Every structure is written in structure tokens, then in C-alpha cells.
Amino acid sequence: PTAMVKPTVAPTIKPSETPLPTETAAPTVKPTTKPTVKPTTVPTATPVATMKTTQLSFAKKSVYIGESITALKAEWGEPERIDPLPQKSLYGYIYNGNSQTEPYLIVGVKGEKVVSYFTIAKNFTAYDAVISADDNETIQQTKLIQQGASAQSMIDAGWTEPGTYEFDALDSSKSEARVGTEAYYKLTDNAYIYAFSDYFDGGDKSIYGMYAFSGECTKYSMMYRTYMTFTDEILRAAEQEVYEMTNAYRNYMGKALFKLEDRTTTAARKHSEDMANNNYFQHNSLDGSKFSARLTAEGISWSGAGENICAGAGDAINMVIGW
């Protein structure tokens, strides 16, 4: 008999399972954060303290309304002298009283600062200016006037004429400046300014000097003699100032300078006192004697003589300009 053979059963082979690749987890990357950069802060500069003022300038020096005495002396040096002025609490710092090369300058000082200035000089210019209060440096300038300006240019620039209550030689019937006047006037933000020409100079009546004073000073106190005080010391100072201003103008015009003479001074004082005590104003004395006779009475030999007199002017500046 045939033996029965069981068929060989192929073993069931499970297919090899390819292991699924393990997913590599992408690392969590935090987005790059741009660092917050604070804008560079420019430090705020401390504003510069400034002063708007009226400035008088020469080739190498200047002075302005509101300037401290310390700054004034640093630039100009010590004054030749300090005069008491008739305006209340005002002192005049006198520079170059006898100089033929430097500008003649009277700086009015009150409360340790400059409140006025007067000059007769070549080559000056006045400005509306802005000054640094910290270092005294000029920041900005706008020209107001300069020496040598013609009469017509003053009119064109809008300067007007002051009245006779300020300068005796002027004609009060004129409300506006015109060619040939002797003074021009302008009010700035902080000062009253007067510029002077000479009607008799034979030329174009150009500007030879100026006077400015702070707006804090009233015109009454600076111009009217009824608001002023007079002592012997103030009167003696005024005499010297009149002498210096007269020579400053003569120097400006290229003329020989005057010299003081004691006997002539005595004759002039006596006549002034006589006019004041007896309430008159004229060259001849009440007894009829003339100026020349007064010189002779003092022992002065002369070949020619002249005299200027002035009444009603408050200070030396008004006296000289009034002539």
C-alpha cells in the first residue's frame, strides 16, 4: 500500500514589517527676537540765556545796554575817572577823555550795569543785538546806524527828530526829521537812541556821535533838568565833560584841541553864577560888560575870543549837543 505523505506546509511567514521611521521632532526654534533698541536720545541742550539789547561797536571793542560792570572793564579796562552825573544814582565811566586816537566814551552805570552810553568818534556802528548772557558773546546783530551816515539816509531809515524839550538847538515846529537837522531819534526794544549831525559842518550833515539810554530809564529822568540833582561835585564833573566833548568834536573835525586855562575858567564861572543869581541869559552882563571885558578883568591878554553859553540843559551831553 502507498504510504500517505502530508504535504509540506510552507510556514506562514509574516512579512517583515519595515519599521516606520521615527519622526525626528524638529526642535522648537524660538524666532530670533530683534533686541529692542531704544533710540539714541540726544541730550537736550540747556537753552542759552540771551539778552536783546542795543550795542555800540568800534573796531575792537563794544558796549551794550545791560552789560555788567565786570564785562565792561574786562574789555575797556578801568575808566580814566568815574563822574557823578545829575541823573539819580547814575555815574559816568569816562574813557579816552584826552585821546586823539581812541573814541571818546561816557558809559552811564546804575546798579552795577550799563544803562547809557554817549560817544563822539570815528568808525562806530550801533546795532540791535542779541547777546549771550553766559559768555557775553554777540549772537546776532542788525545795524541801526553808523558814523558818517548822511542826513538823507537817516530820514530814509525812518529816524525822526526829537523836540526842543530834549535838545535846545532844534526847531520844535518840525515833526519829522529833514536834511540839516541836528539830531535824529529812534526807539528800539530796550533803548532810546539819539544820533547827532552838525547843521553847520559844511558837508552832508553826516552823523558824528550818538547817545543811547535804557528803556528802563524814563526820558524825563534822563533829559529834563527838573528831575536832576546838582551839587558842586556834579557841576565840576560837568565842566570837565563839556571840555572833553568839545575837544572830541574838534578832534573829529581835524581841528587843534583846546587847553584849559584857570583864569578863563574863573571868568566863565563868574558869569554863569551871575546869570543864575540874577535870572538872565545873555553874553553881556547886566552892567553891559562884554565877554572880552570879563577876560581882561581876570588879567588875560587876548587877540580874539569867543563864548558859548547854554541854559536849561540838564547835563553836559545836552549842553554840548544843544550848542
What is the role of each PLM region?
Residues 2-50:
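Ser/Thr-rich, Proline-interspersed low-complexity disordered segments
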Residues 56-62, 137-145, 227-237, 251-261, ...:
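Second-shell loop/turn segments in exported
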